[in-house]
UniProtKB/Swiss-Prot annotation:
Protein name in UniProt: Large ribosomal subunit protein bL34
Domain of life assignment: Bacteria
A GO-annotated cellular component: ribosome
Gene (name only): rpmH
Provenance organism: Mesorhizobium japonicum (strain LMG 29417 / CECT 9101 / MAFF 303099) (Mesorhizobium loti (strain MAFF 303099))
Biological process according to GO: translation
Listed Basic residues bias regions: 34-44
InterPro entries: Ribosomal_bL34, Ribosomal_bL34_CS
Keyword Ribonucleoprotein (UniProt): yes
Source species taxonomy: Bacteria, Pseudomonadati, Pseudomonadota, Alphaproteobacteria, Hyphomicrobiales
Amino acid sequence: MKRTYQPSKLVRKRRHGFRARMATKGGRGVVAARRNRGRKRLSA
């Protein structure tokens, strides 16, 4: 059986990276919420 998590740096950055977050209104909200909470890492 194939495992569900097949790591790929490229796919990770494209799907969850900072630029992917900033591309949508919802994503900008996620980054803003993480900034307000004081997260060290805002995105993948």
